[in-house]
Amino acid sequence: MENKALNSPNRQYALERTRNIGIAAHIDAGKTTTTERILFYTGLIHKIGDVDDGNTVTDWMEQERERGITITSAAVTCFWTQKQEEGLYKSFEALSNRINIIDTPGHVDFTAEVERSMRVLDGAVAVFCGVAGVQPQSETVWRQATKYKVPRIAFVNKMDRTGANFENALNDMRKKLGAYAFPIFLPIGAEEAFEGVVDVVNQKAIVWGAGDLSTEGLKYEIRDIPAALQDKAKDALQELIEAVSNKDDVIAEMVLEEKPISAQQLKAAIRRLTCLIELVPVLCGSAFKKKGVQVLIDAVVDYLPSPVDIPCAVGLVPGTTDTVQVEADDRAKFCSLAFKLWRDAYAGKLVFFRDRRASCRERVSLVV
């Protein structure tokens, strides 16, 4: 339910329906490609750009387009309504959501750019290469997210590549990052045979057309889980329930009383733990082959926090050393965090800031 006390009547998307997220990864894990696909499936763009062609939305600098890497963080906003689909329970079905995305650099030379972005995120999608698993910069951005207490979900990308191994990438997260990570989706096939994912919570298979890129990944089928994967899917569900019950009192009590746990109850518990940074849900797919991106967007809405789900920010009272708790509230005085300065050849000096409380209008002077 929306908390109307916190939301201005002029706000088109309630704070509860807003997600402020970042996409972070080691270089070449497919971070910008994933972002581009998200923008396409949410309808912000109508033609998918390519990093190698230098025409993606978030790589806008000339140097980025020439080199095919992200140098500076780029912010973009898109909108997503969870579809009602038979066999799949979703936490916020038929509700429209605003997703503000910051696409961060993956190269080690631009680590500071990631650091300043982490300070203003409510949640993050950590992208991992399905072949290489956890790489050096993966560890760096993970530490930065931990430092700023950013809840995150993980997306194992490039499952279509030769040598892709979902289990190895998952074990990497657990061993190298110390993540309490558990899959909520499993791959169907791997390398050239990768065709879709198993939804562990709903116990359904989601399959995209094999090798058919003409539909741009817009069409997929929801099926029963293939016989060869049914035992694995059941085991993954049981492992997920046990992992959640170790951290969540509601599910723990249901397990002890041997009560059946619905997809709705399990998803609610996963969301609670993700927002508390006590669990990392893990998904998989191939952004380049346009498989698994829609379920990733659903997961952003289902599991990552809104501005009202995170602890209050702590700010300084201007002209003093006193601190103040800043909660998301449209009724209160405007308060924001300036996190980046940029000098533009035409506009001059620009200040990027994150609204922490209330909102501002055009042509209003702010004290920085």
PLM region spans:
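Structural and coupling elements of P-loop NTPases
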Residues: 1-361, 366-368
